[in-house]
Every structure is written in C-alpha cells, then in structure tokens.
C-alpha cells in the first residue's frame, strides 16, 4: 500500500503554479526525505496531502482515502508544520486537554509520560518553552494521536544541533515502536541521509527524482579522471553533472544499476545522497525517473571541496 499517491497533482495561486503535474507514489513503511530548493512545492505538496488546501488539478490519495482532510483520512495522519503551531497562552495541561477532545484516538497517557521524560512541566505555558521544547511538544501531541503517517514540514529549521538530534531521536523511536511511516521535508541533507530510506526531490513544482535510497545510490557513481578526457568520456555515459578543474573532472553518472565498465584512466567512487541531491539540483533538466538523463552541464570545480 502507498501512504501517498499523487496523479497529475497541481496547485495554482493566481497565475503561478506552486505544484504542477506531480505524479508520485510513496510506499508504506518508509522514512521519506522530501527535498527541493525554496519554492519547489514541498510545503504545497504536504498541505495538499493533509487537506489544508485543495488541488487545482489532479488527485491525491492518502492512506487509501481520496478525500484528504476528511475525518477518516485525518484519523491516520499527524502533521507538524515548520512554525510549530501551538496555543502559546495555554498551559501544557490545557494543550493536552484540548488535543484529547479534538482527536478521538489521542493517547493521553503517552503524551504525559513523554513530556515527563522531557522534563516539561504541565503547568508551564507553551509560549514560555524553548524552541526545542516547543518542537518536542508539537511532536508529542502529533505522536499521541497514534498516526499511521507522520508528516513533518521542516520542523527543525529553527532548532540548534542538539535539539534537532533529540527531535529526530523521538521520531525514530516512534518508527521502531509503532511502525509509523514518515514524510520529512528538510534542507539538512546530512540528517536526512542518516534516517531516510526513500527519497523524493522536487524541482520547479514537479518530481525530479524519486526512489528507494539504496537503489538510487546503487545506480549512480562518481567518476574521477583527466579533465582533458571529460567530454569524450561523457559522450559514452549517462552524465547527470560534471565538475571540472584544471587537471581533473568529476562526473556523476547514472548507470541504471548495470555494472558499466569504468573508462580507462578513470576511477569510480560510490555516491552519497548529498552528492546525488546537489547534482540534480544543479541540473533541473535531468531526472532519475524512467527515461534518459535529459541534460548535462559542466561546472567549474571548487578546488577547496
């Protein structure tokens, strides 16, 4: 089963398309990294999935329900937004009471126990908590709904490294204990590489890359060799992106999983998720979806890298 399916999905604001012709299937039981530059459509896609806005074109199905935002669909979803929406003037106890009354599957015992472990007193107002504590409170309220799908829209953007680590530790515990599927939008590639096993890259409102992380890494490599031979080598390969220096060039290539021979005088290296992401971000015309790589670009190499 897929937790999210989009078919020709689009959202237009006036004459501007925030998301266009988005077709995507996100399988159950995964931690999904949703990546893209600012304005790529990440938040729009997530808002469509949780029913906060309606599509202009196409359809989106969430947990088998074709009506995002309906009571049955929302029963299985928990959403934590970037701005950590909380009632800042309410105490923690009042927040728990309110959330319990609004959600029929809310696990009060879990929420109280989790906040106790975090050392967050029930008498304190939400607005008096630190940024990390507010993020943990929002996450606790979301997980206490016992969702099948947890949607996180850059919830760690304002957190320090320790708070981000603690936040993700809570998420990973929920995955291990309850089998929650997670869709996580973030710009912090290093964190995503540690936790994600499925990857989606949006560019200009459309899906550019999608697939299992292991499969994507297996069918991409970095070739390093003489800069003078880069063009000749690239003509025989599916090159996504080239970085060229005075002496050496680095070609990120797609192999489609085949054991393509390494050209003479070149060395092959495994690719990291960060390298793959940056290469495709620099090549809006290239795609790892079915079909050929559609663009190749040469960029001067930063010798400090």
Question: Which positions does each model-derived feature cover?
Answer:
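ABC transporter nucleotide-binding domain
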Residues: 166-254
């Amino acid at each position: 089963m897929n937790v999210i399916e989009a078919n020709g999905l689009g959202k237009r604001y006036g004459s501007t398309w925030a998301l266009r012709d988005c077709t995507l299937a996100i399988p159950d039981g995964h931690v999904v990294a949703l990546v893209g530059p600012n304005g790529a459509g990440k938040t729009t896609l997530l808002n469509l999935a949780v029913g906060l806005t309606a599509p202009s074109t196409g359809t989106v199905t969430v947990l088998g329900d074709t009506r995002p935002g309906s009571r049955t669909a929302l029963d299985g979803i928990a959403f934590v937004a970037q701005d950590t929406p909380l009632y800042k003037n309410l105490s923690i106890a009042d927040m728990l009471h309110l959330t319990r009354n609004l959600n029929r599957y809310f696990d009060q015992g879990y929420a109280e126990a989790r906040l106790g472990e975090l050392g967050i007193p029930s008498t304190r107002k939400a607005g008096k908590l630190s940024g990390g504590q507010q993020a943990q409170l929002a996450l606790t309220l979301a997980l206490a709904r016992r969702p099948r799908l947890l949607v996180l829209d850059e919830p760690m953007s304002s957190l320090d490294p320790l708070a981000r680590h603690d936040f993700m530790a809570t998420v990973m515990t929920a995955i291990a204990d309850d089998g929650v599927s997670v869709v996580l939008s973030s710009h912090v590639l290093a964190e995503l590489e540690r936790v994600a096993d499925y990857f989606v890259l949006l560019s200009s409102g459309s899906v550019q890359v999608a697939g299992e992380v292991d499969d994507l890494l297996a069918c991409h490599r970095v070739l390093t060799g003489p800069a003078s031979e880069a063009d000749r080598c690239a003509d025989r390969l599916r090159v996504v992106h080239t970085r060229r220096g005075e002496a050496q060039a680095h070609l990120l290539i797609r192999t489609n999983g085949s054991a393509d021979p390494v050209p003479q005088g070149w060395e092959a290296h495994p690719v990291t998720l960060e390298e793959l992401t940056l290469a495709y971000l620099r090549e809006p015309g290239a795609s790892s979806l079915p079909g050929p790589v559609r663009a190749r670009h040469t960029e001067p190499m930063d010798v400090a890298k």
